[in-house]
Amino acid sequence: MKAKREALISLFHAIKEEKVDSDIIDLLLLINSIKGIYTTSSCSGRIGILEEPSLGAKPLSRWLIKVHRPMSFEEARDALKRAREGLIFLKSQPPIFHVVAETIENAKLVHEIGLASGFKYTTFKAISSRFLVEINGTEYLTVPLGKDGRIIASDEYLKFAISIGNKMLERGKSKLPRLRDNFEKIKKKLGEDPLFIQLKREILEI
């Protein structure tokens, strides 16, 4: 499948350039090694502080800080010093995986294990002749902190919000081992993709 070849090449080069979240590299390699499915954009979960020019203006927003691990109060305070214009939010988001399946049967399999692994917002839809499964959790947190460079939240409240955000991030990440185990089961059923083995050897040299 041409689309999978392109996706694999992109993934392997991103791994070489250290542009992939390190704690999900093994899981992404596992998913992409399975016949009939592959990933597109994915994230291991993140917490950070986002500045938006106005509500919903995501294309123009910018992260003052964004990490894929628990964030410290000191990191947040330093990042807030860079706030200039727009609304300021603390955001915590769970892991998310976009998995393309060749057939509806494969899409249903991926959808089922996403739900079974605790990712309750897992959905899938048809796109042209393929099916896109979004494996997504419920651990989202958005907290307003200020506007136009002015921080309204007190240090005490900021510490509290960061603590909750970190706990939600860790809760989302705690489901990753179960998701990996379930993809191992799918691999036993669908088999390993020879294209994956070939490109992995050529690009990653392993």
From Swiss-Prot:
EC number(s) stated in the UniProt entry for this protein: 2.1.1.282
Pfam families per record: TYW3
Catalytic activity: 4-demethyl-7-[(3S)-3-amino-3-carboxypropyl]wyosine(37) in tRNA(Phe) + S-adenosyl-L-methionine = 7-[(3S)-3-amino-3-carboxypropyl]wyosine(37) in tRNA(Phe) + S-adenosyl-L-homocysteine + H(+)
Alphabetical UniProt keywords: Methyltransferase, S-adenosyl-L-methionine, Transferase, tRNA processing
Protein name: tRNA(Phe) 7-((3-amino-3-carboxypropyl)-4-demethylwyosine(37)-N(4))-methyltransferase 2
Function: S-adenosyl-L-methionine-dependent methyltransferase that acts as a component of the wyosine derivatives biosynthesis pathway.
BP term (GO), one: wybutosine biosynthetic process
Keyword S-adenosyl-L-methionine included in the entry's annotation: yes
Gene transcribed to yield this protein: taw3-2
Family per record: Belongs to the TYW3 family.
HAMAP family the record matches: TYW3_archaea
